[in-house]
């Protein structure tokens, strides 16, 4: 049955506050939720705010479903703001009411919807089976979390302290919290010089294990939303981890790492969850839900950060892009590395095409094409990229990438256990796409009908017409279990439509149209063994932003040779400096409230000069080249240093955006290639492409705009 999607209200970017209808001028009260959207509260708690105008704060009274909570009100960061941490909310809807005791102001009411701490909220039914990993989760102070306390893999929340010593090591703080003699101090980005002691909270939300960290000396008052640690710069960095294969059916044994010197030393708070590591859970929807719940927990503990920065490479970039676009307000800016737009399309298209091509070159027609010709057909700059990516393509096979924690007897087998757990990308996204008509396999938005593989190689004379026709005649496709078959793969049209309208295929016109994006890349295209992290994918994201918004000046690309630090948080490296500059960009944009200009205008004019498209020369003393980055293999200094090699679908004539799931077709005879064919070749071409070849000039089949943001499944 197909997934059912409901659109909920779009969130105000940069906050969680849900606005009430505008009231008449005069004294009034306004309620909002600071810790999350009002409709996605979890765990029974919510940090709320009452903004007062023309009313004495001492006259304000607040109740939840008739229960007076006025005694919990605290003064906020401004005289006209009152705040309270509401606890004990039942599951479902509750009505919060704020009114003036002397009837001096218009009252306000806000409905909040609370969900279980174990979820789900908007990601759909929990996946089963689900293997707990708490007993293997290593704590910052050593040891593990131990066994879970329920079937949802929950643990009791705990707080530990570590400190950094003068030798650059993190150690557990003594139980009596006295300051060790070798304690280091750090100076934060705001100039505070504080003991380098870190408060680490570990717990569970949405069945994942989360960690948060923040500079805090336990000899000072316990932090809460109104008592913030001296060393916190009021920024939260949310870290997203990479991976994808084997990322299903497990809780996960590590987050993306919150005891991060490069961040903590500058005063940033850090958060992550095991379900925000794609190697544990390769599902952007569940990642968004987990982040929402963990950030909510953080805000209830420390107050709302001024800004939240998303930070992730590879599988972490998938999350940063899609959370930023589909669930706006969770991040205010993102720094990505080794990026792709998303896993389900840009990546899957490339690696499954590589699988088909490699099988053809090595098994179907061995010896027919030289390695140079294979490179011309695939587009890759290094031949070994082809087998490397072909292996990665097995993530669509339900039998290959099962996590070690998943018992063999629970795994899918077509004969022995047809109802077992299917270990593939599409089965892990069944809440979105639903099951096919048989009920045994997920719907798949995967298609290669009409794709003229090797078209550019043909037009450039690298291969002959007969070579081109044989390749396309025998390349084949995949059945529901990713067995290689002679026929091409046909997409499920319902799944294809869902992919576009829900943002599973990154649109770029949702929340990403309102935040700064920094794309860092330590170049991997020339890796001798091949590498999946191709530079072209960053340009696919940029092209989607251009198509959605008409401009891309909120997107910056930085490229350097690998081996100079890579994607890390050390401020002495390019990526580490980029985080500081992203912070400055977000901060300056927020301070620019000129109503005469669009959000993108304000982002563009507040971009730090350092954050300009650039690459660095190779070698021990790299020099910066300030140059617009382009998707070319030559024609500029950066393109010469770091060529942008195409994917098989680009070689087949596809768009740079890589956003067509299933192409519309045109008769081969109506193309330039068709005009070159002999009568014999034309007869074969009609058999090879019975429905025609892709007409990439038209939108894809079922291609449609984003339905909205904050969708529920």
Predicted feature locations:
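C-terminal His-loop and adjacent cap/lid subdomain of alpha/beta-hydrolase
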Residues: 25-313, 317-713
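Sec-dependent N-terminal signal peptides
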Residues: 1-10
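C-terminal region of N-terminal signal peptides and the immediate post-cleavage residues
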Residues: 12-28
């Amino acid at each position: 049955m197909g997934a059912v999607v409901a659109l909920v209200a779009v969130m105000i970017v940069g906050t969680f506050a849900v606005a009430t209808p505008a009231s008449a001028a005069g004294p009034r009260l306004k309620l909002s939720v600071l810790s999350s959207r009002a409709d996605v509260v979890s765990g029974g708690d919510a940090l709320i705010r009452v903004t007062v105008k023309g009313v004495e704060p001492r006259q304000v009274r607040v109740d939840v479903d008739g229960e007076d909570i006025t005694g919990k009100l605290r003064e906020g960061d401004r005289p006209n703001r009152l705040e309270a941490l509401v606890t004990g909310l039942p599951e479902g809807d509750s009505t919060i009411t704020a009114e003036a005791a002397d009837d001096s102001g218009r009252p306000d009411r806000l409905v909040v919807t609370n969900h279980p701490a174990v979820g789900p909220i908007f990601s759909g039914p929990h996946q089963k089976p689900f293997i707990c990993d708490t007993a293997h989760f290593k704590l910052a102070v050593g040891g593990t979390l131990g066994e879970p306390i329920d079937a949802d893999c929950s643990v009791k929340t705990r707080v530990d302290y570590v400190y950094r010593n003068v030798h650059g090591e993190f150690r557990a703080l003594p139980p009596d919290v006295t300051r060790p003699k070798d304690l280091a101090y750090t100076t934060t980005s705001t100039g505070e010089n504080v003991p380098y002691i870190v408060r680490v909270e570990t717990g569970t939300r949405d069945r994942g294990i989360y960690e948060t960290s923040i500079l805090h000396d336990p000899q000072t008052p316990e932090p809460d939303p109104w008592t913030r640690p001296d060393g916190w710069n009021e920024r939260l960095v949310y870290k997203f981890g990479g991976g994808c294969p084997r990322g299903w059916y497990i809780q996960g044994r590590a987050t993306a790492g919150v005891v991060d010197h490069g961040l903590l030393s500058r005063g940033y708070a850090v958060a992550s969850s095991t379900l925000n590591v794609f190697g544990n859970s390769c599902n952007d929807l569940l990642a968004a839900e987990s982040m929402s719940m963990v950030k909510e927990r953080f805000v209830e503990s420390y107050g709302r950060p001024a800004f939240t920065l998303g930070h992730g490479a590879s599988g972490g970039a998938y999350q940063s892009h899609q959370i930023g676009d589909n669930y706006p307000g969770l991040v205010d800016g993102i720094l990505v590395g080794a990026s792709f737009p998303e896993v389900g399309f840009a990546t899957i298209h490339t690696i499954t095409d590589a699988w088909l091509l490699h099988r053809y070159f090595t098994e179907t027609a061995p010896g027919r094409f030289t390695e140079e010709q294979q490179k011309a057909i695939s587009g890759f700059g290094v031949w070994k990229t082809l087998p490397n990516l072909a292996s990665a393509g097995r993530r669509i096979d339900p039998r290959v990438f099962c996590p070690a924690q998943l018992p063999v007897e629970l795994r899918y087998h077509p004969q022995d256990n047809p109802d077992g757990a299917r270990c593939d990308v599409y089965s892990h996204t069944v809440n979105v796409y639903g099951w096919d008509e048989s009920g045994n396999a997920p719907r798949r938005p995967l298609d290669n009908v009409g794709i003229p593989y090797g078209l550019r190689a043909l037009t450039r004379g690298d291969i002959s017409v007969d070579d081109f026709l044989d390749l396309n005649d025998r390349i084949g496709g995949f059945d529901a279990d990713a067995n290689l078959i002679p026929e091409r793969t046909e997409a499920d049209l319902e799944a294809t439509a869902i992919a576009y309208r829900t943002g599973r295929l990154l649109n770029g016109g949702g929340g990403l149209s309102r935040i700064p994006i920094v794309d860092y890349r330590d170049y991997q295209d020339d890796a001798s063994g091949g590498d999946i992290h191709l530079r072209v994918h960053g340009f696919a994201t940029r092209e989607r932003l251009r198509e959605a918004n008409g401009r891309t000046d909120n997107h910056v690309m930085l490229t350097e040779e690998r081996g100079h630090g890579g994607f890390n948080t050390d401020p002495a490296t390019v990526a580490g400096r980029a985080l500081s500059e992203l912070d400055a960009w977000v901060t300056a944009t927020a301070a620019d409230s000129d109503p005469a200009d669009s959000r993108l205008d304000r982002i563009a004019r507040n971009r730090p000069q350092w954050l300009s498209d650039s690459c660095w020369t190779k070698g021990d003393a790299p020099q910066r080249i300030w140059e617009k980055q382009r998707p070319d293999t030559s024609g500029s200094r950066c393109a010469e240093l770091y060529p942008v090699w195409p994917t098989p679908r680009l070689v087949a004539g596809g768009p740079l955006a890589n956003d067509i799931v299933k192409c519309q077709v045109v008769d081969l005879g109506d193309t330039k290639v068709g005009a070159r064919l002999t009568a014999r070749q034309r007869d074969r071409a009609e058999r090879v492409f019975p429905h025609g070849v892709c007409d990439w000039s038209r939108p894809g089949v079922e291609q449609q705009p984003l339905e909205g943001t904050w969708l529920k499944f």
